[in-house]
Amino acid sequence: AKHFDGPKMFIAAAEESGNDLLDGRGDAYCGMLNASYNLKLRNINAYIPEYPVGDAEDCADMIHEFIPIAKAIEGLNNLKIISFGPRPLNFLACNAPIKQLYNIGVEIEENSELDLFEAFNKHAGDERIPALVKEMEEELGVGNKKPEILSKLAQYELTLKDWVEEHRGYRKYVAIAGKCWPAFQTQFGFVPCYVNSRLTAQGIPVSCEV
């Protein structure tokens, strides 16, 4: 376990019968206690089910139940959260405990809104904007109530996607912690909700004021 860099689980297979035990003694549960103590001594994080000893069928069930846990651990160990701007005053309770995120394997990149605004302005006139506007028009259909801002929304989406690719580093997954008020709308000229939902649908979760 010390040299395995993936998600780890410890369980013990109980003896199938007492016929072949030395003096009738089984070591599955005792071995599990010993293993858990040694994991703590070595600061190795491993998942141990509530009752980790069972027969073959029980152990198979425990392994099956570990699959979503392992996926979550693997995801966190390959996740980078890119943030823009501090939380607004009224959202102070939503301030993320960054130290604890690092403790569970998440990488954090903090940026200012000014960094984002600069990158957004540098994307003005990007040759990819017209094609993205057309895609948005087709997606919105009759819901396209403000066609005049689509070019800015496309510019913003390209800004975020380029930022993600340039800053993800070795991480497979990226999430964005953004900010949409109070100054965002007046300075950028739009609200980012539509772009946030589009990026989330593309596998880049975005949330504001978190």
PLM region spans:
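An N-terminal assembly and electron-transfer interface module characteristic of large anaerobic redox
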Residues: 1-210
